[in-house]
Amino acid sequence: MPFGNTHNKWKLNYSAAEEFPDLSKHNNHMAKALTLDIYKKLRDKETPSGFTLDDIIQTGVDNPGHPFIMTVGCVAGDEECYEVFKDLFDPVIEDRHGGYKPTDKHKTDLNQENLKGGDDLDPNYVLSSRVRTGRSIKGIALPPHCSRGERRLVEKLCIDGLATLTGEFQGKYYPLSSMSDAEQQQLIDDHFLFDKPISPLLLASGMARDWPDGRGIWHNNDKTFLVWVNEEDHLRVISMQKGGNMKEVFRRFCVGLKKIEDIFVKAGRGFMWNEHLGYVLTCPSNLGTGLRGGVHVKIPHLCKHEKFSEVLKRTRLQKRGTGGVDTAAVGSIYDISNADRLGFSEVEQVQMVVDGVKLMVEMEKRLENGKSIDDLMPAQK
């Protein structure tokens, strides 16, 4: 849990070696990047809002990692973190985002017209389609570090702004604090709402403080466009629907996101963005587009095939269980999404999902008929 700066200054009574965390059993990007020299150099620094190196790394110290998934192991507490503590964040970002250099520039493309295809994914295999991203409001500390007042301000800005949306985006805000446990659970089971903050990563980073104060969900009347407020990021914007029409999901995502950004800019509150990191978010894994385009696809034959993981690697996609990270695939239904966030535009990332999933469905149909998929193996993207 993040401490005040007085506590950080008190720690300086001890040497860097005495304060350096034991990372000997850790499997995360932070543990890989953090050396005693870096710790020594950065331990007395703090951002203007008072976030420190120990605040950044605490979640990765407390959670050594996952046997199959390399976790990130650090979070940002405000926009300035990525600059003040770049000696740690730069190697973490480079390692997590496939060699993305401190001098690289990120590209943004939210023009849905540039997506090719995506309206013809076979609904017998592709059960649902979803695109999400995160956004952070300039001048307000991020969830690991924000005060109650800041968090409530984010919520108020969202309530006031989203209430002005019309047409297909007209909807309503539901604060978590006034929901019954049964209502919350139903929304979680329907994949509309974030889980309760029981994840050790959320707890150790300080993101679950004061729960459920200032948290909520807004969705349009059709429940196809949602905004999560004050979970891991200030805003999580989600477009989703049943079936395989990723083109329509992406169109709604781009149009709705633009409307939301315009509302915040008009209120004098733009989103955190820079040309190196793209959209600035709490977890370094989401920098860039913050975008995850995913489908639930049923592939009972392909998922057992020896080349399944190679197909994923070559198409730059990743698999999760039916319920998301750390869950099992129920009935051979996998959540397949883009592996990249930084260095590729939104259109490029969704295009990879569309093309890769289309190929997987084709492979599944081949395997159903007892045929080989060797000639369908893609080149490395």
UniProtKB/Swiss-Prot annotation:
Residues binding ATP, per UniProt: 128-132, 191, 236, 292, 320-325, 335
EC number in record: 2.7.3.2
Catalyzed reactions: creatine + ATP = N-phosphocreatine + ADP + H(+)
Cited CDD domains: creatine_kinase_like
ATP-binding among keywords: yes
Self-association and partners: Dimer of identical or non-identical chains. With MM being the major form in skeletal muscle and myocardium, MB existing in myocardium, and BB existing in many tissues, especially brain.
Enzyme class per UniProt: transferase
Top-level taxon of origin: Eukaryota
Cellular component GO terms, alphabetical: cytoplasm; extracellular space
Keywords: ATP-binding, Cytoplasm, Kinase, Nucleotide-binding, Transferase
Keyword Kinase among UniProt keywords: yes
GO terms for biological process, alphabetical: phosphocreatine biosynthetic process
Major location (coarse): cytoplasm
Residue span(s) of domain Phosphagen kinase N-terminal: 11-98
One annotated GO molecular function: ATP binding
Compartments reported by the entry: Cytoplasm
Function: Reversibly catalyzes the transfer of phosphate between ATP and various phosphogens (e.g. creatine phosphate). Creatine kinase isoenzymes play a central role in energy transduction in tissues with large, fluctuating energy demands, such as skeletal muscle, heart, brain and spermatozoa.
Any Pfam family matching the protein: ATP-gua_Ptrans
InterPro entries per the UniProt record, alphabetical: ATP-guanido_PTrfase, ATP-guanido_PTrfase_AS, ATP-guanido_PTrfase_cat, ATP-guanido_PTrfase_N, ATP-guanido_PTrfase_N_sf, Gln_synth/guanido_kin_cat_dom
Span of domain Phosphagen kinase C-terminal: 125-367
Protein name, entry field: Creatine kinase M-type
Family as reported in the entry's similarity comment: Belongs to the ATP:guanido phosphotransferase family.
Disulfide bonds: none
Additional remark text: This electric ray muscle-specific creatine kinase (MM isozyme) is isolated from the electric organ, which derives embryologically from skeletal muscle. It may be involved in the electrical discharge process.
